[in-house]
């Protein structure tokens, strides 16, 4: 198999565009600023969208590499590494929060 031939972006490009537009919306900005005290960083959604579109147009190896999360320092980027291998975002129940309905 040629390099990159069997690889596809984990989501359709339309999903990245929708996430980027949501991230840039006024409502999201206000909620994020209220909770975190800083502007939301939407650049990764924009880069993911650009990589996805480049992949659809050219099947570019650079687009594939750009969509992979960074590996530990000095190690290559690995598909499936990161907060959530499908969406690339942390879910609400990751970290110290208890799952919904847990009354402990």
Curated annotation (Swiss-Prot):
Keyword Secreted in annotation: yes
Subunit structure of this chain's protein: Interacts with RTN4 isoform A/Nogo-A; the interaction results in enhanced RTN4-mediated inhibition of AMPA receptor clustering. Also interacts with NCAM1, RANBP2 and CCT8.
Pfam families assigned to the protein according to its UniProt record, in alphabetical order: PANTS-like
Species assigned in the record: Bos taurus (Bovine)
UniProt-annotated stretches for the region Disordered: 58-104
Biased composition (Basic and acidic residues): 95-104
Subcellular compartments: Synapse; Synaptic cleft
InterPro entries to which the protein is assigned, alphabetical: Pants/Emi1-like
GO cellular component, one term: synaptic cleft
Gene Ontology BP, a term: negative regulation of long-term synaptic potentiation
Domain of life according to the entry: Eukaryota
Role of this protein: Negatively regulates long-term potentiation and modulates adult synaptic plasticity. Stabilizes the interaction of RTN4 isoform A/Nogo-A with its receptors, inhibiting clustering of postsynaptic AMPA receptors at synaptic sites. Upon neuronal stimulation, degraded at synapses, reducing RTN4 signaling and allowing AMPA receptor clustering at individual synapses.
Record-given protein name: Synaptic plasticity regulator PANTS
